[in-house]
Amino acid sequence: MNTALAQQIANEGGVEAWMIAQQHKSLLRFLTCGSVDDGKSTLIGRLLHDTRQIYEDQLSSLHNDSKRHGTQGEKLDLALLVDGLQAEREQGITIDVAYRYFSTEKRKFIIADTPGHEQYTRNMATGASTCELAILLIDARKGVLDQTRRHSFISTLLGIKHLVVAINKMDLVDYSEETFTRIREDYLTFAGQLPGNLDIRFVPLSALEGDNVASQSESMSWYSGPTLLEVLETVEIQRVVDAQPMRFPVQYVNRPNLDFRGYAGTLASGRVEVGQRVKVLPSGVESNVARIVTFDGDREEAFAGEAITLVLTDEIDISRGDLLLAADEALPAVQSASVDVVWMAEQPLSPGQSYDIKIAGKKTRARVDGIRYQVDINNLTQREVENLPLNGIGLVDLTFDEPLVLDRYQQNPVTGGLIFIDRLSNVTVGAGMVHEPKNEAAVASSEFSAFELELNALVRRHFPHWGARDLLGDK
């Protein structure tokens, strides 16, 4: 039994009242990243321990596991709370992305513990894709390392605007203010090259001893700032998608009987309300929203992030992968785009290759036209390469088999984020963030109807021996 949880339930007046209170708390998704052995898993274990989120049987098991697999001598090895794979415990490292959940009186949290080894950079990118804040751990003895730079760049590339630089293991440098100041200046020098307007904060701490994690450290009187937990509880997260135009990717056509046809999905951005005039892309057909159906009943309006089913006043042809948006918005379909890519496969990405891609519920095919550059993570410079290797990050030009409706990833991660799928093995081999959609298709779309463009793409895909010309360009 978790005595802290039992006390919270008692204070709220019962389980139902406690659950209602939990629903109204804000949620923060964050990840821990940095170089190997910087103490990421230990930090999460310390957060769970000091916020009293560990059940008594877990604590008892942790004592036994610390004796068997622990790396901290007689002390509790808090990293074992997160490192669940047998290989992780044997090697004392994190391999997979581990998710943990906890809450305080002020906020709920979802933590993604990501691996520090370079060969698991792809796992780190997966964990960062859903987070709003990144905790970058730096070993006070080692300072800023290559993997620290790599994870910082990937975090900002994936749209994370809030970075908390946690300078860990301060106990091993005698809680030196000089060491903290030097590392802080080194990181700020590097961070000046990172894209975007970033909110960067620094906290000196010791995850092993608990200094400045959930309570102020008595050993660092020179630091008067907030603890790590206080930063997490008070940071203001402004979701970009709330202020963006309406985007509703259709994931499923719900047809339980002859009297109901609804289009289910998650509202990617903006808001939608009953009576609103909407447009379906790529067909361009317009209709009005008749109902907004949810698990809890009909609603008059819905907001970004909510799972809903839309019922329209007209029966029109809509299928999985189509996109609904406000009728008065002009968003041309494009057939090519420049995409920031994090490559995740042993086989490198090379020009001329074709892959299946998935974006916002739609599956199609894309060809790699060229690689503009690969980013050198050490100094964030760009260099020309012939292919993009495993864990490589670069800007790639893609051409799609059919016109797609895309947003820039920084504006909308749902309609601007895609994955590459190997056509033979069906394995995900890369992640892409749309850098800039190319508008050549806008001209062609004005010359040909949506039906003509779709028919042209269908003929070229299934009957290539006919030699049909691409209506969107000579390809």
From Swiss-Prot:
G2: region residues: 92-96
Pfam families attached to this UniProt entry: GTP-eEF1A_C (PF22594), GTP_EFTU (PF00009)
Pathway stated in the Swiss-Prot or TrEMBL entry: Sulfur metabolism; hydrogen sulfide biosynthesis; sulfite from sulfate: step 1/3
Region of interest called G5, as start-end residue ranges on this chain: 206-208
EC number(s) from the headed UniProt entry: 2.7.7.4
Gene Ontology terms describing biological process: hydrogen sulfide biosynthetic process; sulfate assimilation
UniProt binding sites for GTP: 34-41, 113-117, 168-171
A single GO molecular function term of this UniProt record: sulfate adenylyltransferase (ATP) activity
Segments for region (G1): 34-41
UniProt region (G4), positions on chain: 168-171
Region described as G3: 113-116
Record key words, sorted: ATP-binding, GTP-binding, Nucleotide-binding, Nucleotidyltransferase, Transferase
Family: Belongs to the TRAFAC class translation factor GTPase superfamily. Classic translation factor GTPase family. CysN/NodQ subfamily.
Quaternary structure, from the entry: Heterodimer composed of CysD, the smaller subunit, and CysN.
NCBIfam families for this protein: CysN (TIGR02034), PRK05124.1 (NF003478), small_GTP (TIGR00231)
PANTHER family: TRANSLATION FACTOR (PTHR23115)
Task performed by this protein: With CysD forms the ATP sulfurylase (ATPS) that catalyzes the adenylation of sulfate producing adenosine 5'-phosphosulfate (APS) and diphosphate, the first enzymatic step in sulfur assimilation pathway. APS synthesis involves the formation of a high-energy phosphoric-sulfuric acid anhydride bond driven by GTP hydrolysis by CysN coupled to ATP hydrolysis by CysD.
Record's protein name: Sulfate adenylyltransferase subunit 1
Protein source organism: Shigella boydii serotype 18 (strain CDC 3083-94 / BS512)
